[in-house]
A protein has these predicted regions:
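An amphipathic, hydrophobic-aromatic interaction surface with interspersed Lys/Arg
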Residues: 1-165
Length: 165
């Protein structure tokens, strides 16, 4: 039974509220709220409240197939989003690793703070309202730029070694 419920498709509506086709329109803050929802007393109701503004009372009256379909949809979308962010993580040299660069991972607040500084926003909370796809694209661009600068620096270093010989 559980296998059948988990295989339910995304419903078009849940409790009369339209279900989006994907989660691309979410703000970064909403994604962060979803991450924190796992620690809620009722994570399922909290997830539905965050995304569709449906109360737990209304959710209890919903068709169980629709609820499971919605949850499966959200789970797959979050996997997709996490993979996108995972695919653009910066690579570090062994020297950077030895120096403790991984200790500079400040989680969600670090992303909010980085984007705020990047865009000249003085209040990090304002970044919570920015679409996650925008933050993702800026992060991807910055990481690509950083990787290019590392390669270029390495080329300059190699050229200097050749000239000194």
């Amino acid at each position: 039974l559980l296998e059948r419920l988990n295989a339910q498709p995304r419903p078009s509506f849940l409790c009369g509220v339209e279900v989006p086709k994907n989660l691309n329109a979410l703000s970064y803050g909403t994604l962060d709220d979803l991450r924190n929802a796992t620690a809620a007393e009722d994570p399922i109701s909290e997830c539905v409240r965050i995304l569709l503004d449906i109360s737990s009372v209304d959710l209890m009256n919903a068709d169980v197939n629709d609820v499971f379909g919605f949850l499966s949809f959200v789970k797959e979308e979050l996997k997709r989003i996490n993979k996108l962010f995972g695919d653009i993580k910066q690579t570090y040299s062994k020297e950077e690793e030895a120096a403790g660069v991984r200790d500079l991972d400040f989680g969600s607040f670090g992303v909010l703070d980085w984007y705020a500084r990047r865009m000249g926003i003085t209040n990090q909370n304002d970044v919570r309202d920015v679409a996650w796809v925008r933050i993702y694209q800026c992060m991807k661009n910055d990481n690509m730029q950083s990787e290019f600068e590392r390669r270029l620096h390495k080329q300059y270093m190699n050229n200097n070694k050749v000239r000194k010989r």
